[in-house]
Amino acid sequence: MRQIAFYGKGGIGKSTTQQNTMAAMAEMGRRVMIVGCDPKADSTRLILHSKAQTSVIKLAAEKGSVEDLELNEVLVEGQWGIKCVESGGPEPGVGCAGRGVITSITYLEEAGAYENLDFVTYDVLGDVVCGGFAMPIRQGKAQEIYIVTSGEMMAMYAANNIARGVLKYGHSGGVRLGGLICNSRNTDREDELIIELARRLNTQMIHFIPRNNVVQHAEVRRMTVIEYDPQNSQANEYRQLAKKIDNNEMKTIPTPIRMDELEELLIEFGIMEQEDESIIAKANATS
């Protein structure tokens, strides 16, 4: 069984990419479980055709404790037999959502949810790699990390920060960076830029996903593109990504870059002009 995690900046399309890729993986015959580690609890909606799956934390609060839960209450089987779980989190402004991730994964392990699987995938909130959200990395639950990014500055900034988190635990545990997934925003020279960022981070751009409105059309119907329009070229993009992950042999300890190196990269590719340096300088001063 391989345990992988998808990290990335909020709004980058991480959950959509993960669900479409795992749908393609299941279509290939792989036995898959998705564990949502985002308080929004939207990591499984396209597989289950639902607004949001009831989370482990919410059910535990209703029942009294996690120990009072039955596995079939929190683990739901969706399209292609994909097993789905949402860890959930507290109400906004109350408590640490990262603790929900820790509680949920511990419960799933003890309840035997990880048996007879080929892939377990964690969909993790990734603007910041705080202790709770880093739990799949920190405790070696996820062995392979895939960072969803784009040619936009803040998406690359987040990718570099996540790479720092992987590096921190890469030597002490078995976690490795499997690659960058470029979820295109149609920015200038985007594929070249992410290939170069990947090179500097000692990894690969494992796949470039072009922008296609069919993704939004499928999402509105709470479906993956694989299910909504299986013959569409975009469905084949996700199938290609699934095959690349399935066969991926390049798993590395990353080499995060400094903020001034990221700045130089953006200038080199014409994304940022010299006069914009103050933006990066301010970010650098607070990082």
UniProtKB/Swiss-Prot annotation:
A GO BP entry: nitrogen fixation
Gene Ontology MF annotations: 4 iron, 4 sulfur cluster binding; ATP binding; metal ion binding; nitrogenase activity
Reactions catalysed: N2 + 8 reduced [2Fe-2S]-[ferredoxin] + 16 ATP + 16 H2O = H2 + 8 oxidized [2Fe-2S]-[ferredoxin] + 2 NH4(+) + 16 ADP + 16 phosphate + 6 H(+)
Modification type ADP-ribosylarginine: residues: R99
Binding-site positions, ATP: G8, K9, G10, G11, I12, G13, K14, S15
Posttranslational mods: The reversible ADP-ribosylation of Arg-99 inactivates the nitrogenase reductase and regulates nitrogenase activity.
Keyword vocabulary terms for this entry: 4Fe-4S, ADP-ribosylation, ATP-binding, Iron, Iron-sulfur, Metal-binding, Nitrogen fixation, Nucleotide-binding, Oxidoreductase
Cofactor section: [4Fe-4S] cluster
A Pfam family recorded for this sequence: Fer4_NifH
Cofactor, how bound (note): Binds 1 [4Fe-4S] cluster per dimer.
Entries under InterPro entries matching the protein: NifH/chlL_CS, NifH/frxC, Nitrogenase_Fe_NifH, P-loop_NTPase
Keyword Oxidoreductase in annotation: yes
PROSITE patterns listed in its UniProt record: NIFH_FRXC_1, NIFH_FRXC_2, NIFH_FRXC_3
EC identifiers of the protein: 1.18.6.1
Residue sites binding [4Fe-4S] cluster per the record: C96, C130
Function text: The key enzymatic reactions in nitrogen fixation are catalyzed by the nitrogenase complex, which has 2 components: the iron protein and the molybdenum-iron protein.
Assembly and interaction partners: Homodimer.
HAMAP family: NifH
UniProt similarity note: Belongs to the NifH/BchL/ChlL family.
Protein name: Nitrogenase iron protein
Native source organism of the sequence: Frankia sp. (strain EuIK1)
